[in-house]
A protein has these predicted regions:
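Active-site core of glycosidic bond-cleaving carbohydrate-active enzymes
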Residues: 1-175
């Protein structure tokens, strides 16, 4: 799905910071279940502060996330935004972005794409995306003979040749 993060653009901060919010939630809940109240309280405060900072930095009052970046919409909906008016605005803008621009999600966000569209009341759009045969799309990969989901939407070109971009392996700098 292109360089591990995004299909057409790289905006790491909203994606990585959404994971920080998620991690703080998991850690605070884990501490609570383990009976470590002081730790749970500390991580809950960090979670609240980080969530607030994320929303202030990446989500406009009109519900635009990270300059209208699809993966950021997904990560904000999945890990950051609580129920409420702002979340509903974000859902609407997310669906509108996909209708306007087509599929542009990256590796970390794509797994959450279809369920979040369904949650937003966009089941038909979710099915349209799932079944689209062009690149980017899952059916494109199947038509090209894929038996698993590729790391890049366009790992194989329509003519059957491999997209030549270097892999991000740690040995690249040795070649």
């Amino acid at each position: 799905m292109g360089k591990g993060i995004a299909w057409q653009a790289m905006h790491n901060n909203p994606v990585s910071n959404a994971f920080i919010v998620h991690d703080l939630k998991v850690i605070s809940e884990t501490a609570e279940r383990l009976g470590k109240k002081a730790d749970a309280d500390r991580y809950r405060r960090q979670l609240e502060a980080t969530t607030k900072a994320y929303i202030e930095k990446f989500v406009s009052k009109k519900g635009i996330v990270a300059k209208d970046y699809q993966s950021a919409y997904i990560m904000a909906l999945k890990f950051v935004l609580p129920e409420g008016e702002l979340r509903e605005l974000v859902k609407k803008n997310f669906a509108a972005n996909i209708r306007k621009n087509g599929l542009q999600t990256g590796f970390f966000a794509t797994e959450h794409l279809l369920p979040l569209l369904v949650e937003a009341g966009e089941t038909e759009l979710a099915y349209d995306i799932l079944l689209q045969e062009g690149c980017p799309g899952w059916m494109y990969q199947i038509k090209c003979g894929a038996t698993t989901t590729w790391e890049r939407w366009d790992a194989l070109k329509p003519d059957g040749t491999v997209n030549e971009e270097k892999m991000a392996g740690s040995g690249d700098n040795m070649v």
